[in-house]
Design a protein with these regions (language model features):
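Hydrophobic/aromatic residues within well-ordered alpha-helical segments
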Residues: 2-6, 26-30, 68, 82
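A general structural signal for well-ordered alpha-helical segments in protein cores
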Residues: 6-10, 23, 27, 47, ...
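Metal-dependent phosphoesterase signature
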Residues: 11-52, 57
Length: 182
């Protein structure tokens, strides 16, 4: 489900669980719960350190999430200081993103919005969803797949990623020509 647009993920869930609800019925019932529980979202271990490190070294960073803008705002409300360090934030319901992951649209849009002349080959994507790794590859960007072992898949995604780790704490920026952690 990770890396899919909200409607597609919800429709898969409803079908798999054989629930007699439409997307809109489910969405209306789930909105209140999402606001409560998504508001308690924690950052991945190592994420804050990496974001602050890149910011201190003036390395441009963008965020491209399949989440809707509304859900992104709820999930990140407790971390505004960190998410304020991104030069570009692109959500899955952004009108400039025509196709959701695994299409490369969201990454290319986020890169363009940095407005600093980057080419896809200059970018490194951190991705926790298989669709996102595939999207990064389609965009011709390197990717670090931060696999959440709770959602382990059996697809070919590992061979698509430039690197495969299970925690951002394992990431070594020097491997990608970036400054070492202090």
């Amino acid at each position: 489900m990770m890396g899919r647009d909200v409607r597609t993920a919800t429709e898969i869930l409803l079908a798999d669980l054989d629930l007699p609800l439409t997307f809109d019925e489910y969405d209306n019932q789930a909105t209140e719960l999402k606001q409560i529980y998504f508001g308690m979202a924690m950052m991945m271990p190592g994420a804050e350190r990496l974001i602050r490190h890149l910011n201190v070294h003036s390395i441009p960073i963008a965020l491209a999430t399949s989440s809707s803008k509304q859900m992104f705002e709820i999930k990140t409300a407790a971390h505004k200081d960190i998410f304020g360090l991104f030069g570009s934030i692109t959500c899955g319901d952004d009108p400039e993103v025509e196709n959701s992951k695994p299409a490369p649209d969201i990454f290319l849009t986020a890169m363009r919005r940095l407005d600093n002349g980057l080419e896809p080959e200059d970018c490194l994507v951190f991705e926790d969803a298989e669709n996102g790794v595939e999207a990064a590859r389609s965009a011709r960007m390197s990717s670090v797949w931060v696999q959440d072992l709770r959602f382990a898949g059996d697809g070919p995604v590992e061979s698509m990623a430039t690197e495969h780790i299970t925690s951002l704490l394992e990431f070594d920026p020097v491997k990608y020509g970036l400054p070492a952690y202090d």
